[in-house]
Amino acid sequence: MAFGGAQASYINPVVPFTGMIQGGLQDGHKITIIGAVLPSGGNRFAVNLQTGYNDSDIAFHFNPRFEEGGYVVCNTKQRGSWGTEERKMHMPFQRGCSFELCFQVQSSDFRVMVNGNLFTQYAHRVPFHRIDAISITGVVQLSSISFQNIRAAPKQPACSKVQFSQAVCLPPRPRGRKSNPPGIWPANSAPIAQTFVHTIHSAPGQMFPNPVIPPAVYPNPVYQLPFFTSILGGLYPSKSILVSGTILPSAQRFYINLRSGSDIAFHLNPRFNENAVVRNTQINGSWGSEERSLPRGMPFFRGQSFSVWIMCEGHCFKVAVDSQHLFEYHHRLKNLPAINNLEVGGDIQLTHVQT
């Protein structure tokens, strides 16, 4: 299926936040972050444009620091090692005040705009098409993260000229009280209707095409299960699969299978009666050893929406649930291009698929 969807914005994401950039970055893509710096609670925040959900490979680390008069550090991390810092001895952000931060991808560098004004340009140190995730940490409250392909929308400015003649500032947080900012829900407690906006309805801008093969997006509001579709070209390192839906109130289990012919290379099987997320591989009709360990509790809940992102790496699958990295599953079938079918079934309502 030809690619032609749009990546929905992240609305009121909770910090620390890590989310996927569907298809990876390309020349002409723009990411716009709307938020506010908290009045207190720390001296720094950071925006990382990175590969995957871990922080060992960060193509662009943008790190405002409210220290020594205020400055911004820009850097790149490769295989866990930081490069040479670039410091901008000017602070365009104010504590307690709102901001618009825009990253525009150009062939030679990132163009960074703050509140409609050019702040800096950061030359690429690694190929930008490897970037498929965005991570934000520190003393910020976020309203939205939106995505746009300005090459596909030439009538719109590269970065919106938002006038901040009167800064919108946040009151200091009362001492002894920690509350979520208005409109922000804790993990796994967002209303289903809110998630449906993210998974079914498109947002302004264009989804980013995959650097190798454009992903197929199936925007049907409801799918019949079991759902089965091909993965054009099969899997390869950096290829990602996105599956979103809502778990039925009386659900017992559901599954996501990545198949190679009659074999199942990766079987992801949340089981509510066992409070477990089972992973396995089936070869020639025989199942291997199950993997069940999780770094934290059950990430799926009856009656609630979910989003599963499966990133294929050279040695494993990396799996994130609701923008939180969950586990890695090492390949047992290692012929990745032969893994070319996706199957989804069980006690869910399926609302969004991207292969």
Curated annotation (Swiss-Prot):
Pfam families: Gal-bind_lectin (PF00337). Its main location: cytoplasm. A beta-D-galactoside 1 binds at residues 48, 61, 65, 75, 82-88. One of its GO terms (cellular component) is extracellular region. CDD domains: GLECT. It comes from the Eukaryota. InterPro entries: ConA-like_dom_sf, Galectin-like, Galectin_CRD. GO terms for biological process: immune system process; negative regulation of CD4-positive, alpha-beta T cell proliferation; negative regulation of type II interferon production; positive regulation of gene expression. GO terms for molecular function: carbohydrate binding; galactoside binding. It is found in: Cytoplasm; Nucleus; Secreted. Keywords: Cytoplasm, Immunity, Lectin, Nucleus, Repeat, Secreted. The keyword 4Fe-4S does not apply. The keyword Plastid does not apply. Residues 17-148, 227-355 form the Galectin domain. A beta-D-galactoside 2 binds at residues 267, 271, 281, 287-293. PROSITE patterns: GALECTIN. Contains two homologous but distinct carbohydrate-binding domains. Binds galactosides. Has high affinity for the Forssman pentasaccharide. Ligand for HAVCR2/TIM3. Binding to HAVCR2 induces T-helper type 1 lymphocyte (Th1) death. Also stimulates bactericidal activity in infected macrophages by causing macrophage activation and IL1B secretion which restricts intracellular bacterial growth. Ligand for P4HB; the interaction retains P4HB at the cell surface of Th2 T helper cells, increasing disulfide reductase activity at the plasma membrane, altering the plasma membrane redox state and enhancing cell migration. PANTHER family: GALECTIN, GALECTIN-9C. This is Galectin-9. The lineage of its organism: Eukaryota, Metazoa, Chordata, Craniata, Vertebrata.
